[in-house]
């Protein structure tokens, strides 16, 4: 499930309108609408707010957000699967903390 789909699924499952969620996030409803449609990327700072609205783990929601960011970088690349495998190997070999230090 993509981040955009997760946003919509959470909103609908909790019975909120886009207008209500936008108001809780203090953003324009048109901006929120674009988040759900995948026409605009949500700022990372909003992840905690969204998680709090739905009473879910920010870490879990952040995984969807990060996956969406990776997807947005690679979706047009012919060798996307190879690149993802290389990154996965680097994480296993060097550890994510080592990669962040570099």
Residue ranges of each PLM-predicted region?
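Helix-turn-helix DNA-binding elements, focusing on the entry/boundary residues of the two helices
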Residues: 7, 18, 29, 44-47
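Short basic helix-loop element that most often maps to the first helix and adjoining turn
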Residues: 5-24
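Conserved hydrophobic/aromatic packing and binding residues within compact polymer-binding modules
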Residues: 7, 21-22, 32-35, 61
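Short amphipathic helical patch at the helix-1/turn junction of helix-turn-helix
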Residues: 1, 12-13, 41
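Recognition helix of helix-turn-helix/homeodomain-like DNA-binding domains
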Residues: 25-41
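DNA major-groove recognition helix of helix-turn-helix/homeodomain DNA-binding modules
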Residues: 45-60
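Short, charged recognition helix plus adjacent turn
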Residues: 62-102
């Amino acid at each position: 499930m993509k981040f955009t789909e997760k946003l919509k699924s959470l909103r609908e499952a909790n019975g909120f309108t886009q207008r209500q969620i936008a108001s809780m996030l203090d953003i324009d409803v048109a901006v929120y609408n674009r988040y759900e449609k995948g026409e605009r990327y949500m700022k990372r700072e909003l992840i905690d707010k969204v998680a709090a609205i739905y009473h879910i783990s920010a870490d879990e929601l952040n995984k969807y957000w990060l996956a969406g960011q990776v997807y947005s970088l690679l979706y047009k690349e012919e060798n996307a699967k190879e690149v993802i495998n290389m990154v996965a190997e680097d994480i296993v070999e060097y550890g994510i903390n080592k990669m962040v230090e570099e």
